Amino acid sequence: MTMPTEGTPPPLSGTPIPVPAYFRHAEPGFSLKRPGGLSRSLPPRPPAKGCIPVSRLFPPRTPGWHQPQPRRVSFLCETSEPLQSPGYDPSRPESFFQQNFQRLSRLGHGSYGEVFKVRSKEDGRLYAVKRYMSPFRGPKDRTRKLAEVGGHEKVGQHPHCVRLERAWEEGGILYLQTELCGPSLQQHCEAWGASLPEAQVWGYLRDILLALDHLHSQGLVHLDVKPANIFLGPRGRCKLGDFGLLVELGSAGAGEAQEGDPRYMAPELLQGSYGTAADVFSLGLTILEVACNMELPHGGEGWQQLRQGYLPPEFTAGLSSELRSVLAMMLEPDPQLRATAEALLALPMLRQPRPWNVLWYMAAEALSRGWALWQALVTLLCWLWHGLVHPASWLQPPGPPATPPGSPPCSPLLDSTLSSSWDNDSIGPSLSPETVLSRITRRTSTPRGRYIPRDALDLTDVDSEPPRGPCPTFEPRNLLSLFEDSLDPA
């Protein structure tokens, strides 16, 4: 296949459903990542129903998997046994998760579930527990969600794969307890805010290739390799997780495989061809994204160009020639010619871990811990200084708020001490306060029927008070009398 030259994008072809030409202006090219929060965070889903549907015609039947008691989930044994723990009391209303774990923080959440950082009350160790948001909607939905547990058990133990401790279902909700890892690669890149150093990229690439080689050697395909499913461990070691879309090649369920994120999808998946080469292509796009701080397109012409082996030179110009050649091997459009994980690990630049990678990780971790210690020390010194300067302010209880002293009522119209810098001739003759008050009284639209002294303002503090004239009286009359007066000839 002819490769497009630099600056000449390839035509829109190569997939069973080509993108129409009028979509070319939808995404005019490739762009950098948008600064800010999580760009891929989804809006919260509406609250799901907490109970199974109930029919009015047939008696309600509660399925066996919708029991309130927790039951262990495992595909290694034939029967599902009840979950037992020394700190769990079935008579209490709290769930097994609430009784056996201390929730510390929430690590992340998505459209289907949320992950918590917890401390086990059994052994005191830290774990991560993933809890699905909604209960099982039926047998098919339960089978689809339990597939993640089966994927973890098929993968087994590997230093670059997230380890599953146990899984259970309670009240129709699935829980997965895994080892605690650091933030995901997506969160790490968004916190970094720029392209990752190439030393880190090489280390991440080698770790995930080791995980994929372990999966592919057992005939397993991940089908959802992306930065959100790659987690950082101690000393910068990466681990691959989220095996919900895992497919075993040659099995009966391989034809019902589901695709992952379309931004990292291999082109052969659109034709229904599932293989280990799809994971290598997704990993290549992941490395291209984190190494170039590039926003991968969801579709359009840019999506087609990446599936035809086109690497945008404006992004890859800052990469080394070795990394560009590895990306070209991983993003080969033909899955038969695409390099495998085993072949990539045999390359000289990926055969052994680079020594400066470990030094970089150790220096970054030491700097992070030193900065946290410095912040804690500054906070302690500020607290001690405040206690020495104001020793009694933090010992005595706070008193009631003081009320400001009341000020005597003032009347701007009667205050003869007010002066103005304006020219008196320019604004007319000067008037005394008594004259102004009498004019205001005469211009009142609704006269009062009787003057009551308590309705007047308290002007006892004023030196001189103007004499009050007689107030006009008003005699109320009904409409009939007014109508008769109008008919009476003058």
From Swiss-Prot:
It is found in: Endoplasmic reticulum membrane; Golgi apparatus membrane. Mg(2+) 1 binds at residues 229, 242. The keyword NADP does not apply. It catalyses: L-seryl-[protein] + ATP = O-phospho-L-seryl-[protein] + ADP + H(+); L-threonyl-[protein] + ATP = O-phospho-L-threonyl-[protein] + ADP + H(+). Its EC number is 2.7.11.1. GO terms for molecular function: ATP binding; metal ion binding; protein serine kinase activity; protein serine/threonine kinase activity. Its main location: endoplasmic reticulum. One of its GO terms (biological process) is negative regulation of G2/M transition of mitotic cell cycle. Keywords: ATP-binding, Cell cycle, Endoplasmic reticulum, Golgi apparatus, Kinase, Magnesium, Membrane, Metal-binding, Nucleotide-binding, Phosphoprotein, Serine/threonine-protein kinase, Transferase. The keyword Transmembrane does not apply. ATP binds at residues 107-115, 130. Negatively regulated by hyperphosphorylation during mitosis. The hyperphosphorylated form does not associate with CCNB1-CDC2 complexes. The PLK1 protein kinase may be required for mitotic phosphorylation. SMART domains: S_TKc. Autophosphorylated. Phosphorylated by CDC2-CCNB1 complexes on undefined serine and threonine residues. The phosphorylation by CDC2-CCNB1 complexes may inhibit the catalytic activity. Residues 389-490 are annotated as: Interaction with PIN1. Residues 1-20, 33-67, 444-476 are annotated as: Disordered. Belongs to the protein kinase superfamily. Ser/Thr protein kinase family. WEE1 subfamily. The membrane-association motif is essential for the localization to membrane of Golgi stack. According to some authors, it is a transmembrane domain; the existence of a transmembrane region is however unproven. This is Membrane-associated tyrosine- and threonine-specific cdc2-inhibitory kinase. It comes from Mus musculus. The gene is Pkmyt1.
